[in-house]
């Protein structure tokens, strides 16, 4: 005897739900958005891990430098325990940050997830010097 699924038992596969719910952004999107939002204070790899809930933040700054042909400022900071040090990365200008935001929006468009809004872009850019 063949069992038939009743409509209430079948998973709802309508595209309506997917059209109104935004797709979760990938790790790179979250990391890049965090990095741009830190302003002149900059960020460390550990801060990327903590704020974006990632397991590794090591290559995100270097990848941006290679992809966008920009150079991040690196400040060597001693660790709180006095053993070793780590880098604090900072974007130098608002133009560099605009390149990152353009990359974020380009990837968001391709991946069909939420891009950076104009208002948020303006807020982020106001955190950086223009030259």
Which residue stretches match the model-derived regions?
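Short, basic interhelical loop/turn and adjoining N-cap
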Residues: 52-59
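Amphipathic alpha-helical dimerization/coiled-coil segments
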Residues: 102-131
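Short acidic, hydrophobic short linear motifs in intrinsically disordered regions
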Residues: 39-49
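Short amphipathic alpha-helical interface segments
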Residues: 28-40
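Short Gly/charged-rich anion-binding patches and loops
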Residues: 30, 59-60
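DNA-binding patch around the recognition helix
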Residues: 2-25, 61-108
């Amino acid at each position: 005897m063949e069992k038939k699924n009743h409509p209430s038992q079948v998973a709802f596969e309508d595209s309506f739900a997917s059209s109104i719910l935004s797709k979760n952004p990938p790790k790179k999107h979250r990391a890049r958005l965090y990095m741009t939002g830190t302003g002149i204070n900059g960020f460390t790899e550990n801060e990327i891990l903590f704020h974006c809930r990632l397991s590794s933040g090591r290559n995100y700054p270097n990848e941006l430098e290679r992809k966008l042909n920009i150079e991040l400022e690196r400040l060597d900071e001693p660790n709180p325990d006095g053993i070793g040090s780590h880098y604090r990365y900072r974007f130098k200008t608002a133009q560099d940050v605009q390149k990152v935001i353009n990359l974020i929006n380009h990837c968001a468009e391709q991946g069909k997830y939420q891009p950076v809004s104009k208002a948020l872009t303006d807020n982020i850019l106001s955190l950086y010097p223009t030259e």
